[in-house]
Amino acid sequence: MIKIHLSRLLGAHRMTQAELSQKTGIRAATINEMYHELIERVNLDYLSRICEVLGCKVEDILEYVPDSYKMQYRADRQN
């Protein structure tokens, strides 16, 4: 499973989803899907744009979590 830490990064930068959308040229709906970890595929160009705007690395946005932790992660998100 891949976790997306966009919500944490935007909070750290005190930036809204709308501001990130405007600065990157990425559709607001796509930013929202990434923010809520609902997106199934991530465009590499989008990652590059986000990294440029937020001054971060790809590994700051994406994290690989072994599938053995998937069930616990889902349970934690529902609580």
Residue ranges and their predicted role:
Residues 1-16:
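A short, Lys/Arg-rich alpha-helix, primarily the initiator
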Residues 8, 62-79:
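Short, charged recognition helix plus adjacent turn
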Residues 17, 44-47:
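Helix-turn-helix DNA-binding elements, focusing on the entry/boundary residues of the two helices
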Residues 46-51, 61-62:
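Hydrophobic micro-packing sites on short alpha-helices
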Residues 15-33:
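Short alpha-helical DNA-recognition segment
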